């Protein structure tokens, strides 16, 4: 019985070591991937979306004031290309955890340019939508804004 207990303890310790090693390896792999992938297209896409939202809000405000001149904006081919390339970049990352880290990295770099909490919320919202738009569904347990954890 004592030998069985020792054997079980050794197996449990071995499983823990292997799991910890795999996790550490996964973290290092993600860091390498994030250094290699260029997230510029994602940043450009998010910038365009936030700018578009602001223009739409300004247009609504003009309408409410009775100004009839409203700019209709259609999605340009450049915007579509930025989104496509962004999705390709995110898809290159091999795990949801790594994709989440990429979105957090974009948030950290882009939030510095935000003028107020409303723009930060728009940024967060656009980043949360991105995985669904790219076709790999919502990221589970991914807090885009690491300051809110």
Swiss-Prot record:
Keyword Signal: yes
Annotated compartments: Endoplasmic reticulum
The keyword Signal belongs to this UniProt entry's keyword annotation: yes
Disulfide bonds: 30-98, 42-86, 87-134, 87-134, 100-142
One MF term in the entry's GO annotations: nutrient reservoir activity
Matches recorded under InterPro entries: Bifun_inhib/LTP/seed_sf, Bifunc_inhib/LTP/seed_store, Napin/2SS/CON
Signal sequence, start to end: 1-22
Keywords annotated in UniProt: Allergen, Disulfide bond, Endoplasmic reticulum, Signal
Pfam families: Tryp_alpha_amyl
Cellular component per GO, a single term: endoplasmic reticulum
Assembly notes: Heterodimer of a small chain and a large chain; disulfide-linked.
Family per record: Belongs to the 2S seed storage albumins family.
UniProt protein name: Conglutin delta 3
Organism of provenance: Lupinus angustifolius
Species classification: Eukaryota, Viridiplantae, Streptophyta, Embryophyta, Tracheophyta
